[in-house]
Amino acid sequence: NHLIEVGGHFYWDIYALYRHIIDGLKLVAHRGESIASIGIDTWGVDFVLLGKDGNLLRQPYAYRDPHTVGAPEAFFSRISRSEVYGKTGIQVMNFNSLFQLDTLRRNHDSALEAADKVLFMPDALSYMLTGKMVTEYTIASTAQLVNAHTQRLEPELLKAVGLQEENFGRFVFPGEKIGTLTEEVQKITGLGAIPVIAVAGHDTGSAVAAVPALDRNFAYLSSGTWSLMGVETDAPV
């Protein structure tokens, strides 16, 4: 996965990621391996914009792109930092989806203005495999758009960036079925109607779920792009 620099901005090549997935599925089919299901997780915050016809409007911005520098301060002039944090419980960082979307809104971005749906990266890849649009809870939580108490998209924050819940896919939690491989993907890969299941779409969430702890009294340290330490709780602290 490599950044693409075009016109002074950094993007992800989601079609390359899709091609890599297809190549992997072809290899599995060639080996005759049995697949019970497919799940996709990725890094957080980044997203794609889809038009009314379901097609990609633009390659997704990469969170390392500098277009969101100063974005939190601009947003907090309308809704306070404490209110945003109180609803979401997410660390304020300029590249969170909330601030990416608000930056696009303030700049009258043509892709956002034409967008019918917003899909986070793992959900976009699942959509390309199944034709089904969903918004998985853990990946949506990285956006700073999910209310940690209701575990749903927060209407006030959506309104602030000019969106509604209808602009996102069906809200799902890990373990729910998204769909099955489309006939096109089946034909390309040589696989059958394999189910695609929502996992913790945020890769850190999937990593924590896989911690081989024997009881609930444990802490985790997940090291990837950076290191995150925490504990599992039944409700927000």
State each model region's role.
Residues 72-78, 93:
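Flexible glycine-/small-residue-enriched beta->alpha junction loops
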Residues 31, 78, 107, 111, ...:
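Alpha-helix C-cap/termination motif
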Residues 13, 38, 65, 104, ...:
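Residue-level signal for inorganic ion chemistry
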Residues 47-73, 115, 119-154, 191-237:
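Glycine-rich phosphate-binding loop of actin/hexokinase-like ATP-binding domains
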Residues 23-31, 103, 107, 211:
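A generic secondary-structure signal
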Residues 1-58, 74, 86, 170, ...:
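N-terminal glycine/serine-rich phosphate-binding loop of ATP-dependent small-molecule kinases
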Residues 42, 64, 175:
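Residues that line or immediately flank small-molecule/substrate-binding pockets and catalytic motifs
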Residues 84-204:
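Gly/Ser/Thr-rich active-site cleft segment
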